[in-house]
Curated annotation (Swiss-Prot):
GO molecular function: 5-dehydro-2-deoxygluconokinase activity; ATP binding
Name used for this protein in its record: 5-dehydro-2-deoxygluconokinase
Xref: CDD domains: KdgK
InterPro entries, alphabetized: Carboh/pur_kinase_PfkB_CS (IPR002173), DKG_kinase_firmi (IPR022841), Myo_inos_IolC (IPR030830), Myo_inos_IolC-like_sf (IPR023314), PfkB_Carbo_kinase (IPR050306), PfkB_dom (IPR011611), Ribokinase-like (IPR029056)
Any GO BP: inositol catabolic process
Classification via PROSITE patterns: PFKB_KINASES_2 (PS00584)
Metabolic or biological pathway: Polyol metabolism; myo-inositol degradation into acetyl-CoA; acetyl-CoA from myo-inositol: step 5/7
Keywords: ATP-binding, Kinase, Nucleotide-binding, Transferase
Catalytic reaction equation(s): 5-dehydro-2-deoxy-D-gluconate + ATP = 6-phospho-5-dehydro-2-deoxy-D-gluconate + ADP + H(+)
Family: Belongs to the carbohydrate kinase PfkB family.
UniProt superkingdom: Bacteria
Documented EC number(s): 2.7.1.92
Top-rank EC class of the record's enzyme: transferase
Length: 339
């Protein structure tokens, strides 16, 4: 069912916009970060991971960001290119800004943390002049990362992209993607998140992220239904609110809602599932699936990622996700995540 109409004449399917980083995941797990001696390098950052996830699922993907003008920047550009992602709109930082670095700590399957270096960061240097109207026009949808709204000039660039998308019937998917270290205060988060959300067609985020977005207009925490109704009232077609291990719910503009639970899986780490969830869910709605099927697909992809060492490198293909779902249903029953 087409809850959202995408312009099928456009050559690109999706353009994620914003953060791309380098992840260093420890090879020695179940120990503190200070005791880890060796790491494996991966591409990271939510928009970067979502781009890779969608490309693995067969979508035609572009990417709009700024990366460092050094070896790590080369790594990111080459990695995305090798995944079949269009790199024509990836810019290079001009004043020595670097890619963000993320070191992960895996103390146990349920206890993980991340250490981020985000000072003088390249992706926040994307300027409004580097946002091509023709490029945004060429895509069926863009994915805006909340982190891209946190600092200038990236903030202004993101809103220019939003304006171009509205002008040219390019659908807007807003991934709240909150990272505390990039914002000055909670009021700033609420203002800029709300402005972007009022322009979006789909919003995806955790309950905590929605609370931050609604901090000024609703000082008392809203329940999920109230939150969904608020943002659907501004024109969104789908609002997805995630509750971690308790699952997630998609609220639709026609008043219906669908809930999905996580697939049972042996965890390796407690991070990385959200980007896989987003890419697989976006794939499902772009394919015209029922929302419950898109949610199930997203939940399956997320489960596969939290059982893997990496994020971007482990992004699955369509048949791999379908096989995972088939096996889990054979083991646990047809309604394993829908009941």
């Amino acid at each position: 069912m087409n809850y959202i109409k995408f312009d099928e004449k456009k050559p690109l399917d999706v353009i994620p916009i914003g953060r791309v980083t380098i992840d260093f995941n420890p090879n020695e797990i179940n120990r503190p970060l200070e005791e880890s001696r060796t790491f494996t390098k991966y591409l990271g950052g939510s928009p970067g991971n979502i781009a890779v996830g969608l490309a693995r699922l067969g979508k035609k993907v572009g990417f709009l960001s700024t990366v460092s003008d050094d070896q790590f920047g080369n790594f990111v550009v080459n990695y995305l290119k090798n995944e079949g992602i269009d790199i024509s709109q990836i810019n290079r930082a001009k004043n020595g800004e670097k890619l963000g670095l993320t070191f992960t700590e895996i103390l146990s399957p349920k206890e993980s943390s991340i250490l981020m270096y985000r000072k003088g960061i390249a992706d926040l240097q994307l300027s409004s002049k580097e946002v091509s109207e023709d490029y945004i026009k060429s895509a069926k949808a863009i994915v805006i990362s909340g982190t891209a709204l946190s600092k200038s000039p990236s903030r202004e660039a993101a809103f220019v992209a939003l304006e171009y998308a509205k002008k040219h019937n390019t659908r807007i998917i807003f991934d709240l993607d909150y990272r505390e270290y990039t914002w000055n205060c909670k009021e700033e988060i609420a203002i800029y998140y709300s402005l972007a959300a009022r322009m979006s067609d789909v919003i995806m985020g955790s309950r905590e992220e929605f609370n931050l977005m609604e901090g000024l207009i609703s000082p008392e925490e809203s329940n999920d239904k109230e939150t969904a109704e608020r943002w659907i009232g501004y024109g969104n077609k789908i609002v997805v609110i995630k509750h971690g291990k308790d699952g997630s719910t998609a609220y639709l503009h026609d008043g219906t809602s669908y809930k999905i639970k996580p697939f049972p899986v042996k965890l390796l780490k407690s991070f990385g599932g959200g980007d896989a969830y987003a890419s697989a869910f976006i794939y499902g709605i772009m394919e015209g699936w029922d929302v419950i099927d898109a949610l199930e697909f997203g939940s399956a992809s997320a489960a596969m990622l939290v059982a893997s060492h990496s994020c971007s490198e482990a992004m699955p293909k369509v048949e791999e996700i379908k096989q995972f779902i088939k096996e889990k249903k054979e083991e646990h029953g047809e309604m394993v995540v829908r009941g």
